[in-house]
């Protein structure tokens, strides 16, 4: 299982929101590029970058910062937020993104998903964000009358192989992931699943690790890493199935600049 640190961008800063609410924002760093480098230095093998301004406005807004991140790290980066045109897909891939995530477009522009999949294959993911089992779009401000599994199966028919599945009620809350919803989503869709939302401690990661046989191949971590409730070294050890014996020493990590 892959651990993917999240870098959420708003007005050029690295931030975290609670349940996607702008009025519950914490700014962790004014230098997202340095944050990306820090996660890479601590062993991350992929990063998850979200353009929050893009998600709320409908078009990418932090391309300069995203480009700097892509140039600064040597590990793959998946990017989402406001990608609702083929031009945006192409621009991000040209900048060096390994994957692009289509969220709102999955509902409003399914033809874009089909075209992007046909052209770029598994470099195209869908982000399916659920609130009480229903799909939320446009920066999570609008909930539509479609179930998360229903949408995932539609996207699978269009060629999608992998989905980022987020439980909005858990995102940024440190309340633990919605394991039942993740299990149901993975089992019902047969997609490769990247779970997101709510991870708060090592036990949460161990529980997600057990869902690997269902197709849960990765977990996006945000607030737990930024708040220090889980260390990167611990997360990586659990994800790889190589947790150290009790009392064993682990590699020392540099403390995040915001602590």
Swiss-Prot record:
Record keyword Zinc present: no
Major localisation: cytoplasm
Enzyme class: isomerase
UniProt similarity note: Belongs to the HisA/HisF family.
Pfam families recorded: His_biosynth (PF00977)
EC code: 5.3.1.16
Record's keyword annotation contains Cytoplasm: yes
Organism: Pelotomaculum thermopropionicum (strain DSM 13744 / JCM 10971 / SI)
CDD domains: HisA
SUPFAM superfamilies xref list: Ribulose-phoshate binding barrel (SSF51366)
Entry GO MF terms: 1-(5-phosphoribosyl)-5-[(5-phosphoribosylamino)methylideneamino]imidazole-4-carboxamide isomerase activity
Protein name: 1-(5-phosphoribosyl)-5-[(5-phosphoribosylamino)methylideneamino] imidazole-4-carboxamide isomerase
GO cellular component: cytoplasm
GO biological process: L-histidine biosynthetic process; L-tryptophan biosynthetic process
Reaction(s) catalysed (UniProt annotation): 1-(5-phospho-beta-D-ribosyl)-5-[(5-phospho-beta-D-ribosylamino)methylideneamino]imidazole-4-carboxamide = 5-[(5-phospho-1-deoxy-D-ribulos-1-ylimino)methylamino]-1-(5-phospho-beta-D-ribosyl)imidazole-4-carboxamide
Keywords assigned: Amino-acid biosynthesis, Cytoplasm, Histidine biosynthesis, Isomerase
Active-site annotation: 8, 129
Pathway it works in: Amino-acid biosynthesis; L-histidine biosynthesis; L-histidine from 5-phospho-alpha-D-ribose 1-diphosphate: step 4/9
Localization per record: Cytoplasm
